[in-house]
Amino acid sequence: MAYYRTPHDVTALPAWQALQKHRDAMQSFSMREAFAADAKRFDQFSLSACGLFLDYSKNLITEQSRDLLVNLANEVGLQDAIKSMFSGEIINASEGRPVLHTALRRPVGDKLSVNGVNVMPEVHKVLNQITELVGRIHDGLWRGYSEKPITDVVNIGIGGSFLGPELVSEALLPYAQRGVRCHYLANIDGSEFHELSANLRAETTLFIVSSKSFNTLETLKNAMAARTWYLAQGGSEAELYRHFIAVSSNKAAAVAFGIREENIFPMWDWVGGRYSLWSAIGLPIALAIGTANFKELLSGAYTMDQHFQTAPFDKNMPVLLALLGVWYGNFWDANSHAILPYDHYLRNITKHLQQLDMESNGKSVLQDGTPVKTDTGPVIWGGVGCNGQHAYHQLLHQGTQLIPADFIVPVVSFNPVADHHQWLYANCLSQSQALMLGKTREEAEAELRAKGLNEADIEKLAPHKVIPGNRPSNTLVVERISPRRLGALVAMYEHKVFVQSVIWGINAFDQWGVELGKELGKGVYQRLVGSLEDSAEDGSTQGLINYFRGRHRG
């Protein structure tokens, strides 16, 4: 039976139990000693794929560790699970849906049936729609109510309708097309809309309302605010269609808002929000970098899809990263994972990966609804490299928790300034090196002695300068950030998350936990504005409602 119909108890598998024994044997393993003993360790634990280079040699593993982890992947039926996803089986069991974001990057001529219908012609029809719209806007043919060309595009969306597109359009800023600026409006906080609209002119602004249901609270409220602002700035209801388009599966609601049907781009229920940047949700990406570059992004992701499906697990980049995550989360008690990009343009990748990983694998039941017997998804956190060194890297080096990290760095900068990039790259490498090597008591004492400190002061200060080392990390190197390589990088992390969900036996493609807060929020709002008089379900919430009502004016 397919893994999503009869999930396994992973802790009962022979491979899992073998890993538990191996973990005990690895208690005294030292990466420092492993590198000293094996000149080929770097070569044995590194690989290239799809324009990415992965060094995973600075991990608490041996070749036996890798073999045992690959055995685990085989025992959970990972190869069949991969085939199930790519062929359109209903692996999102709780919602009864296939999972086919990978179809969005498949080339023309491919066939893929969902419920007996080949979906690929529709996928490429939408891609052609995107190409046509982007061309009109870039050529100055799409004009606002005053007949001036569009200069600014505002994407109104939240979650997956925002994080992925923002990541890509900012990561590929060096590829930005002249004449059109892209902005993002996500939060329901009025200050965000105020700050954004202050720098826009209604007559040359196009809003994209991105919401599958056309009913997402934050998105709908911001769309209404944009509509009100547009009218107040001199726009008319009759010309509204020039300034609002939509990406939604709810055509009726979008048309009722004032958007013309031909300006509504479809969404499919087999593409989840956090996997949707490859769809029409990526329209702001195409507007920012042009459709040729957008198609390169898709092509890069497709190459990673091919690698994921065909490479042996011990040479498969997403699989190896997933297995290392399981190794640390389930056998070394790691509760979080740091993402550390050493590139200004990649500064938003951590936010995207937070949603991708935590919304996917933040689950506590198996696919059949029974409780899991082991920890699942970790906390994902981090930020831009050098800034982090002067903030939270201290915890990575000398804290009590084991926190694996991914360093991401390009070889070539788009904007070289003197020797800045050489220092940036050096900082990235030295941080991963310091995490691995650490500093022994003897080294700390020798360092202080060389500075001329007396023995009494050395005795006091040396313990504070000891750094445990043996902290694991991966280093992902790209020659230069490009649409193709970025597509491969994001797809790699998508597949990593999926692999971990298969191992744990959970559903990576639903997000029921998000819904409860939305439901309760309606009641809280009604009590805040006085339209509901009964008390909240608990005293804390009611107390905070009372505090607001006693002080808010307006």
UniProtKB/Swiss-Prot annotation:
Keyword field contains Cytoplasm: yes
Enzyme Commission number(s): 5.3.1.9
Pathway the protein contributes to: Carbohydrate biosynthesis; gluconeogenesis; Carbohydrate degradation; glycolysis; D-glyceraldehyde 3-phosphate and glycerone phosphate from D-glucose: step 2/4
GO CC aspect terms: cytosol
Pfam families per UniProt: PGI (PF00342)
Main location: cytoplasm
Keyword list, A-Z: Cytoplasm, Gluconeogenesis, Glycolysis, Isomerase
GO function terms (MF aspect): carbohydrate derivative binding; glucose-6-phosphate isomerase activity; monosaccharide binding
CDD domains: SIS_PGI_1, SIS_PGI_2
Similarity comment: family membership: Belongs to the GPI family.
HAMAP family given in the database record: G6P_isomerase
Name of this protein: Glucose-6-phosphate isomerase 2
Species assigned in the record: Pseudomonas putida (strain ATCC 47054 / DSM 6125 / CFBP 8728 / NCIMB 11950 / KT2440)
Name of the coding gene: pgi2
